Each structure stands twice: as structure tokens, then as C-alpha cells.
């Protein structure tokens, strides 16, 4: 099925309406559960109540976060690997998260980074190259002394994916896209 931009915008806006105002966002370490109906996995690193109007109106079949998404003090230390979005106790959305890749930076085993439109997991800790970063959708991607595996498409970008308890955490970017034009 293919849909016009108007229909795709309406679909994206309906997701925000269905979840409701001021949902709770939780950032976790560990492996992402198989689906939103499965119990949380890993440690909750950060918890934040989002603004009442937490997503901007959809436009051109894309819908981006609205307002500031921030936790003034992280709940625990760990590596941000996935997020879950709740209305009350019900998880409605989950997906990958990480920080933007940076050159000549030390990365830890299992740390997630975002490069281009992809999320990568560090499988060999080390220091990234001075430029470029991981690319492609394979495994064993060499970048300086780091080795990366492709995990999935970019969803949520944090200011820092290696979180310390008490640290302020900010979601820099979050966007939904509706394909099938």
C-alpha cells in the first residue's frame, strides 16, 4: 500500500494522540525486549516525563520531538542501548538509542553510537578513527581500534550514551518517519 503525505502525516499524528500527553520515557542498558508487550529488560538508566505536547505536528511524512526531553539526574550508571515510552504502566513504543559517533574517542564494549542513519554496537572496545566512523549494515566494522556491528536504524540520539548515576541526560533528536510514498 502506498499513501499520500497527508495520510502518512495523519498516521504519525495519531500515534501521539493514542499515547496521550506527558508520557514517560525510560532509557535502559541491556538487550531490547522482543516487543512492547514483554517486561522491561536491563537497568533503567534515566526516567523523564515528556512535555504535554511531546511531538511536533507531522510534516512531509516525518514527526520530530517537541520541547526539551531531559532527566536532571540519571537513575543509574550504564550504557544506553534502548528506550521505552509509556502511558501509565503501558509500554507503547520501544527502540534503539545511542550517542552520535565522534572521532578519536574511546568507546566501551556494547556502547551504542549513531553514525549517519544507523545505530552500531561496539564489539571490541577501543578508540575510534579521527574521521569517518562505522558505516554499512554488517558486522566486524573496523574504526580505529574499535570494532562495530550494525544494530538497526537511527531512532533516538542522546547527548551521552555512557551514563553515570546522577548525570543530566538529554535527548538530542527523536523522529518518526512514515514511508510508502
Language-model features, listed with the residues they occupy:
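Small cysteine-rich, disulfide-bonded extracellular modules of the LU/uPAR three-finger superfamily
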Residues: 1-83, 87-98, 151-181
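Tryptophan-rich substrate-binding surfaces of secreted polymer-degrading and adhesive proteins
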Residues: 98-152
Amino acid at each position: 500500500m502506498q499513501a499520500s503525505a497527508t495520510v502518512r502525516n495523519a498516521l504519525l499524528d495519531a500515534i501521539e494522540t493514542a499515547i496521550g500527553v506527558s508520557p514517560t520515557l525510560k532509557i535502559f542498558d541491556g538487550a531490547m525486549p522482543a516487543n512492547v508487550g514483554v517486561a522491561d529488560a536491563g537497568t533503567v538508566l534515566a526516567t523523564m516525563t515528556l512535555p504535554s505536547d511531546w511531538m511536533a505536528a507531522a510534516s512531509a511524512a516525518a514527526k520530530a520531538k517537541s520541547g526539551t526531553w531531559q532527566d536532571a539526574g540519571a537513575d543509574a550508571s550504564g550504557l544506553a542501548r534502548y528506550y521505552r515510552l509509556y502511558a501509565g504502566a503501558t509500554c507503547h513504543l520501544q527502540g534503539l538509542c545511542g550517542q552520535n559517533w565522534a572521532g578519536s574517542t574511546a568507546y566501551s564494549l556494547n556502547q551504542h553510537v549513531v553514525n549517519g542513519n544507523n545505530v552500531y554496537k561496539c564489539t571490541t572496545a577501543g578508540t575510534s578513527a579521527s574521521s569517518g566512523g562505522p558505516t554499512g549494515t554488517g558486522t566486524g566494522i573496523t574504526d580505529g581500534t574499535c570494532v562495530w556491528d550494525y544494530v538497526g536504524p537511527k531512532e533516538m540520539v542522546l547527548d551521552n550514551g555512557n551514563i553515570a548515576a546522577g548525570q543530566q541526560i538529554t535527548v538530542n533528536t527523536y523522529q518518526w518517519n512514515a514511508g510508502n510514498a
